Design a protein with these regions (language model features):
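...captures the hydrophobic TM-helix bundle architecture rather than a specific catalytic motif
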Residues: 2-244
Length: 244
């Protein structure tokens, strides 16, 4: 009578995906959930950004009551309306929008370099360096965005253009704050070796999010560069509300 041969014990390969220390699930499963959550956040941000772009374009094209932007609309003689105040001020300079976007692009490039290095080559040092540089440039972009807002030649009540531009810049600040918050976590986790060649989904998600932030900046830069003076120089005039 032959004795059954026992099954060989499972071996642990160096390339085996580790399990989560909290749930015991494969890190691939955790990564898949993380990607789904990331796309939900991106869809939410896309919806808000597109709404701002549409609002900007709508107000720019209508120029109702000549209230699009400083120094006010050029009204014809038969459209004189004393209830319309002539706004004073200037449009925002265009180059700071492009400069700030350039800084964000550099930060995103560093993050992608670090992520690709650790995923394909297992270069842990490149991820630490890339995420740290991305964090520094993101903070620089946030400071530059704040300086731009504080030096605008108009306030939020100086026409529809002023309000629309300020909202776009506020959206940029919100996106940059998320980027900085996430990058702080990436830097800390990469320094501790928690992000490596086997577990890289957090660096990937951060790279995806930063790519979307660049696209959001680009959409804002396009409208603030090529849609400045309203094409409607003969705007409609509507009555104003008066307190009885």
């Amino acid at each position: 009578m032959t004795t059954p041969t026992p099954a060989p014990a499972p071996t642990t390969s160096a390339s085996q995906v580790p399990l989560s220390p909290t749930t015991g699930e494969s890190m691939n499963v955790i990564a898949r959930r993380g990607r789904v959550g990331l796309w939900f956040i991106i869809v939410m941000s896309v919806s808000g950004t597109i709404a701002l772009i549409i609002s900007y374009s709508y107000l720019w094209s209508l120029n109702v009551n000549g209230g699009w932007a400083p120094p006010g609309a050029k009204l014809t003689a038969n459209q004189t309306n004393n209830t319309i105040g002539k706004l004073r001020g200037d449009f925002a300079p265009e180059w700071p929008f492009w400069a700030i976007m350039g800084v964000v692009i550099v930060a995103t490039a560093f993050m992608w370099w670090g992520y690709r290095s650790v995923r394909t080559k297992g270069n842990h040092g490149a991820l630490v360096a890339g995420s740290t540089l991305a964090l520094i440039f993101s903070i620089a972009a946030l400071v530059a965005q704040w300086i731009q807002i504080s030096t605008f030649p108009f306030g939020p009540t100086n026409g529809a253009y002023a309000s629309a531009v300020l909202l776009l810049c506020a959206s940029n600040i919100f996106n940059l704050l998320i980027v900085i918050f996430v990058l702080i976590g990436i830097v800390n986790r990469s320094r501790k070796g928690l992000i490596n060649k086997l577990v890289w989904y957090q660096a990937q998600a951060t790279s995806y999010w930063m790519t979307w932030v660049v696209i959001a900046f680009l959409m804002g830069v396009i409208v603030t560069t090529f849609m400045v003076e309203s094409p409607n120089t003969d705007p409609s005039i509507f009555g104003g509300f008066k307190q009885q």
